[in-house]
């Protein structure tokens, strides 16, 4: 059948219903896609559950996720025994601590608990915050819309139960308390700042540990020479980031797998050759003996021992497209035995050679395997560092979607893998910081002390957010939640106290970096929220818009104008400012808001929301383009084509229904609660009136709350060809105006504080924020807007 005929047939079928008492829905442009996307998501996970795909993913994730954890064995013992081994049994005590710390934090907490808190395949602190944000309105930006909850995979409810009531109570508590919202936000950005600081410290400590192995063969090498070799490798590592890893990424898994086999075999060799009795470390009594014997020094050493599970946070954050089963399989059968064997083997070696603790890993390597091990160590350390650098890029991208970071240029290095990012400015700063850290600290022991606080703080914050997820999202038994919370907060608090005791010996560096990052995030987010609230309070009224559109001085020009605004509700105050300066309006005007939702991805079929602004003859529309925090913005040309196609669909849908007074209005006196029902029995009506700050973009009211006499009426049981032709004519008008040209109108808002504001507020807004805004990427570059089609409109807000 001809596609055009089929399309018209579907339109006729859509309205071929009787209006008398049948619950009908006034669909928004996206509402009809929700169930389709939901089924698509189910099919996706079914595909992931196949064993063939699981085994393939298990192999691939070895190279992407395990590089950092797999190279920690290069420096753990040397960092722990900084002043030498005091007692022969200390080696067994430390090994016991390493084994149980690794099992508790990496295996149990991350691999078998935290991975289940992934956000549709995305992990890390940001994913946990997004999960919480979807189930409770904790965002500080007042731009939530009822339609957001219609996005497939947004959130779900459950059957009435004690756990559900507890979750509802927690939801109300988080939404009602501004202090709770701010605390949750600060915890999240602190963890994110620590992850970025970790990306500065991981490359130096990993590469420096690997390069340090040269001293086993070239003992006359000085510390400075080792440092400068490391710096050279780091510069090359950061320089190649612009090319992406998709061309060489396929080799990561074989390299890391070979590395794990190598260190596992070497560990087994050392265990058999030197001292098999170190296996008694699996008895936890040696941990107690270690603390009794060393007292304060044993407690202080915990900070270095926690380096054995560094990389666990990156494993969770870089979860990406890997399934939970694939990670658990590869972790259990590849990483876990290899890592345990290498720590056990090094302990066996140290029990017979306690003076070789400064470079335990390479000293314990058989002579015949030294050079292969050295080369593999360099390669593995680079791959492990690459994972943290990529994690930093993704984190900055997520921060921008949260409106917590200035605009930076983000490049996608792979068409095949959309998640591979490169941020030139961030890459340069990471490179400089990593080189400065290497040259300043010179040894892995000091860098390790700095690294410790990043690892433990991210772990603690993950525990806190996981506890909220268990109560609010998972809704599991309170006893399991209490067990998880008490076990991990108590043990992590002990590790944190050990790290803080050595604060002046290294941890102050990542703390200082994190403070700077947090100041930038807080200032940017604070001003963004204030500016948004200002625009919301000064939204242009319906009467004012009608007055401007009906003005005789207002001229119409051919073409389409896209007016970008961050406001998702109503018309921004910059619009009358533009009309006052340039009394001209295009034939089609679309107010566009780019909005990021707390979901990883928004399907293109669910991207756009439309609403027409009165007067309808003027063809003025409001549009919200919704993206997930991992979605990238399209090129302007592609974006416009997709937008106008969806606009034409909206015009078709909205004209299928009458605008008789019976249509339920947003201003109706019956203002019932919003409802979100699937299209299987109950439907909803969307208001057509232009929005005010207190209204949703398209308010949804359950029709069951109304009498049958108040249901929307169709023009006829079947639309005639004349009406269909009218719809097609309006669609053609949009298409012709697009051919005349598209103009992008971008507001340049200068934010200043009121004259009588406090000195601190003046410094934050007038100086710090102003500096950030002027020295980072401008809006048109972020949106890929061609310069010759750009019109900037300046305005100043006093907040």
From Swiss-Prot:
Keywords: Ion transport, Membrane, Potassium, Potassium transport, Transmembrane, Transmembrane helix, Transport
One example of a Gene Ontology biological process annotation: potassium ion transport
Record topology, Extracellular segments: 78-93, 203-219, 273-301, 350-362, 442-452, 497-508
The protein, known as: Potassium transporter 21
Membrane topology: Multi-pass membrane protein
NCBIfam families found in the cross-reference section: kup (TIGR00794)
A GO cellular component entry from the record: membrane
Major subcellular location class: membrane
Membrane-crossing segments per the record: 57-77, 94-114, 182-202, 220-240, 252-272, 302-322, 329-349, 363-383, 421-441, 453-473, 476-496, 509-529
Taxonomic source organism: Oryza sativa subsp. japonica
GO molecular function: potassium ion transmembrane transporter activity
Job description of the protein: High-affinity potassium transporter.
UniProt subcellular location: Membrane
Cytoplasmic side stretches: 1-56, 115-181, 241-251, 323-328, 384-420, 474-475, 530-799
InterPro entries, per database record: K+_transporter, K_trans_C, K_trans_N
Similarity section: Belongs to the HAK/KUP transporter (TC 2.A.72.3) family.
Top-rank lineage group of the source organism: Eukaryota
């Amino acid at each position: 059948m001809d596609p055009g005929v089929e399309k018209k047939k579907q339109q006729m079928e859509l309205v071929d219903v009787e209006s008398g008492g049948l619950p009908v829905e006034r669909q928004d442009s996206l509402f009809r896609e929700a169930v389709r996307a939901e089924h698509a998501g189910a099919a996706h996970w079914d595909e992931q559950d196949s064993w063939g795909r699981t085994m393939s993913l298990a192999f691939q994730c070895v190279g992407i996720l395990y590089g950092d954890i797999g190279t920690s064995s290069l420096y753990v013992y040397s960092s722990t025994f900084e002043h030498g081994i005091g007692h022969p049994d200390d080696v067994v005590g430390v090994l016991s601590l390493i084994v149980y710390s690794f099992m508790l934090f990496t295996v149990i907490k991350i691999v078998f608990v935290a991975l289940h808190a992934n956000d549709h395949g995305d992990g890390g602190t940001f994913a946990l915050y997004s999960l919480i944000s979807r189930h409770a309105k904790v965002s500080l930006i007042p731009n939530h819309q009822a339609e957001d909850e219609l996005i497939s995979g947004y959130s779900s409810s459950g059957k009435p139960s004690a756990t559900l009531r507890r979750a509802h109570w927690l939801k109300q508590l988080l939404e009602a308390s501004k202090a709770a919202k701010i605390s949750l936000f600060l915890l999240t950005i602190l963890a994110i700042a620590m992850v970025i600081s970790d990306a500065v410290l991981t490359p130096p400590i990993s590469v420096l540990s690997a390069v340090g192995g040269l001293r086993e063969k070239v003992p006359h090498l000085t510390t400075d020479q080792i440092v400068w070799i490391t710096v050279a490798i780091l510069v090359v590592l950061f320089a190649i980031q612009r090319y992406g890893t998709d061309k060489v990424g396929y080799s990561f898994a074989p390299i890391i797998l070979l590395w794990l086999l190598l260190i596992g075999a070497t560990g087994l060799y050392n265990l058999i050759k030197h001292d098999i009795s170190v296996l008694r470390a699996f008895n936890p009594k040696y941990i107690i003996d270690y603390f009794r014997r060393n007292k304060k020094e044993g407690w202080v050493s915990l900070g270095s021992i926690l380096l054995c599970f560094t990389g666990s946070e990156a494993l969770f954050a870089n979860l990406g497209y890997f399934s939970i089963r694939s990670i658990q399989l590869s972790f259990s059968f590849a990483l876990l035995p290899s890592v345990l064997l290498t720590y056990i083997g090094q302990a066996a070696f140290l029990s017979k050679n306690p003076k070789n603790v400064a470079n335990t890993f390479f000293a314990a390597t058989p002579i015949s395997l030294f050079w292969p091990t050295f080369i593999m160590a360099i390669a593995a350390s680079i791959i492990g560092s690459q994972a943290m650098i990529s994690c930093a890029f993704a984190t900055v991208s997520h921060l921008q979607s949260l409106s917590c970071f200035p605009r930076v240029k983000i490049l996608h290095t792979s068409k095949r893998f959309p998640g591979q990012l490169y941020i030139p400015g961030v890459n340069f700063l990471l490179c400089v910081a990593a080189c400065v850290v290497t040259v300043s600290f010179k040894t892995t022991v000091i860098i390790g002390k700095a690294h410790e606080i990043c690892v433990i703080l991210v772990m603690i914050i993950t525990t806190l957010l996981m506890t909220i997820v268990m109560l609010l999202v998972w809704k599991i038994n309170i006893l399991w939640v209490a067990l998880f919370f008490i076990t991990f907060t108590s043990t992590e608090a002990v590790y944190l106290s050990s790290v803080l005791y050595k604060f002046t010996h290294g941890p102050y560096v990542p703390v200082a970096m994190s403070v700077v990052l947090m100041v930038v995030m807080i200032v940017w987010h604070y001003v963004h929220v204030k500016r948004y609230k200002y625009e919301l309070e000064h939204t242009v009224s319906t009467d004012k818009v009608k007055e401007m559109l009906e003005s005789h001085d207002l001229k119409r020009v051919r073409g389409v104008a896209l007016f970008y605004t961050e406001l998702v509700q109503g018309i921004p105050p910059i619009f009358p400012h533009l009309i006052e300066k340039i009394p001209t309006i295009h034939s089609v005007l679309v107010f566009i808001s780019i909005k990021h939702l707390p979901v990883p991805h928004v399907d293109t079929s669910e991207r756009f929301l439309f609403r027409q602004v009165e007067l309808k003859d003027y063809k003025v529309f409001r549009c919200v383009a919704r993206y997930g925090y991992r979605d990238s913005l399209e090129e302007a040309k592609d974006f416009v084509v997709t937008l106008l196609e969806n606009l034409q669909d909206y015009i078709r849908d909205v004209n299928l229904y009458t605008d008789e007074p019976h249509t339920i209005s947003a201003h109706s006196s019956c203002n019932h609660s919003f409802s979100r029902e699937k299209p299987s029995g109950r439907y909803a009506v969307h208001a057509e009136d232009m929005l005010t700050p207190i209204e949703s973009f398209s308010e949804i009211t359950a029709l069951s709350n109304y009498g049958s006499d108040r249901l929307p009426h169709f023009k006829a049981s079947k639309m005639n060809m004349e009406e269909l032709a009218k719809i097609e004519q309006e669609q053609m008008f949009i298409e012709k105006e697009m051919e005349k040209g598209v103009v992008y109108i971008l507001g340049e808002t200068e934010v200043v504080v009121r004259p009588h504001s406090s000195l601190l507020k003046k410094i934050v807004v007038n100086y710090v924020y102003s500096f950030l805004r002027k020295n980072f990427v401008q809006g048109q570059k972020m949106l890929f807007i061609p310069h010759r089609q750009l019109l900037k409109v300046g305005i100043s807000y006093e907040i």
